[in-house]
């Protein structure tokens, strides 16, 4: 039984569904964050948000959303939802939602007439790639799906205004297209497991509003560019996988990649498992180093917070190896500062005077959980 499940009555009531946000991360710094009805309510929301090392490792929204449309008998049924200037909600795709479930991955079930369509999203671990699997559960006639990618290519705390400086070239690749709107950004690759038709139809969509930013009294309106749309016919019982990432992938590998990733997920069948999933999303791996983020989408890696939260974020959920990796990275930065006075490029606040005390406290929790002998053998040389 799923611990996180919302029915139609809650989903179509925006007063109840819009405040509920979800976060997916890849433990490499990238994330996907939006509401459970896929309507972005903060400028930091997006389908694919990645850190860019060449830009100071700050987060950048690459793909804001992917708007789906179901076509039957030539009639379109739009599943997307956005808030535009003046508080106008369009195209009100939430009215087709029948259920939202998040046992292993977020899954939204839509019903449009005789069509039942499910959408499941999953982030690939340690890779800047998100996969979305669409499955046509039921249909009584020929069905086609249309997808409009809404591109941003901006820093997560900034907003985009319609301009003529963007690169409008959208070259086609294997089962998809790629885009790089501005100089200095990596290329975004959008591909499908099935061969789609691509129609280049570029337009600026103006006046997106982010209600959470409006409530905070900060800038909240932007314009986003849509280069065109994909169309893919789909049959009853068939699944189509969409991939958005910073590298090209073989379309044939998408189904295998999806199944491999979902097998590693912890099912949210209890409150404890929900907490485990939540804290593991704050792990950050960078080559041989490992960090603990203070949170998304604003959190950084802070030295004091790392030492304070580390036992609860690792030992409490039986992740001893992750404790040791994160502690090793943090102690290395702390020792380097104490010897040279140099600040760490990734861990902020390493120069605070109480960091050594919190580090020792975290090691004491490690000793309590395992043994003083093991803790001494592993860490005594670091604290002398």
Predicted regions and their residues:
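Terminal accessory carbohydrate-recognition/targeting modules of carbohydrate-active enzymes
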Residues: 1-267, 297, 319, 331, ...
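Non-catalytic, well-ordered alpha-helical scaffold segments
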Residues: 145, 273-277, 357
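Active-site-adjacent bridging/hinge elements
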Residues: 209-216, 276-289, 329-339
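Short helix-capping and inter-helix turn/linker motifs at the boundaries of alpha-helical repeat units
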Residues: 124, 270, 287, 299-304
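Aromatic-rich carbohydrate-recognition surfaces in CAZymes
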Residues: 138-139, 160-163, 234-236, 300, ...
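Conserved oxyanion/phosphate-binding beta-strand-loop segments in alpha/beta enzyme cores
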Residues: 260-296
